[in-house]
Amino acid sequence: MATADEQEEEMRMRLPLPLGGRVAIVTGASRGIGREIALNMAEKGAKVVIHYSSNQHAAEEVASIINNKSPSSGDGVRAIVCKADVAEPSQVAQLFDTAEHAFGPLHIVVNNAGVTDSKYPTLAQTSDEEWDRIFQVNCKGAFLCSREAAKRVVRGGGGRIINISSSLVAMPIPRYGAYTASKAAVEMMTRILAQELRGTQITANCVAPGPVATDMFFAGKSEAAVEAGVKSNPFERLGKVEDVAPLVAFLASDEGEWVNAQVVRVNGGQV
């Protein structure tokens, strides 16, 4: 005879998953925030395309975790990987083609892929090449993926475009000029896109994390710089990827439909 806990778990498993039947692309999903977003969405029922640009092994590891720990839906493979340069239109189109071929119509696109300059130069010290590199991935990449999503994501309900920005846009900090400018552009682009998608029931929002304990955050920072980030937060800690992913999944769900054209800053009250 099943225990009370076992009965409760069985009942929970029978409940419809909030992202059940949905298909999602998550860019930059091989590590960091993107990895956790992909894992969280899969746990909530979505089939997920794990996009990566260089680290195939890490991307395949994420897909393996999802496929080895699938909800009891019996629908086979629920995650695949796909390499693409998000700043190249043809490769972005191929990414979407791959997703549709594997899983059918798309519902959710999370544009998370991003880069920064771990040397943290001032604007006066920022090279043309570095400025262009950051804008190519962070801004053009988000634009190309959002443009493709606007054409391909399902209409009539359940369509979601979620761009990952940064709380730095709301707190201009020296030596993040190119990165912050690229994310500011993404925020305004997203708000305009939401208005242009009027009548489709596709929502477009930004999630803007504060400092999160990822490889990208730690790269090039001294212990003192990290500690300063910790102390500046009311919680006196860095954010965790687990602080961000559930919010993204909420925006992707039916419950998040009335949130549209918004920038949601998730930073523990830092700004």
Curated annotation (Swiss-Prot):
A Pfam family of the record is adh_short_C2
Under which main EC class is this enzyme filed? Answer: oxidoreductase
Q: Is-annotated flag, keyword Oxidoreductase?
A: yes
Q: Where does substrate bind?
A: S166
Catalytic residues at Y179 (proton acceptor)
Its EC number is 1.-.-.-
Task: Report whether Oxidoreductase shows up as a keyword of the record.
Answer: yes
Please provide, alphabetically and separated by semicolons, the GO molecular function terms listed in this UniProt record: oxidoreductase activity, acting on CH-OH group of donors
Taxonomically, which superkingdom?
Eukaryota
| Binding residues for NAD(+) | 25-49
Keywords (alphabetical) are: Oxidoreductase
Family classification: Belongs to the short-chain dehydrogenases/reductases (SDR) family.
Q: Which PANTHER family match?
A: NADPH-DEPENDENT ALDEHYDE REDUCTASE-LIKE PROTEIN, CHLOROPLASTIC-RELATED (PTHR48107), RE15974P (PTHR48107:SF7)
Protein name as it appears in the record: Short-chain type dehydrogenase/reductase
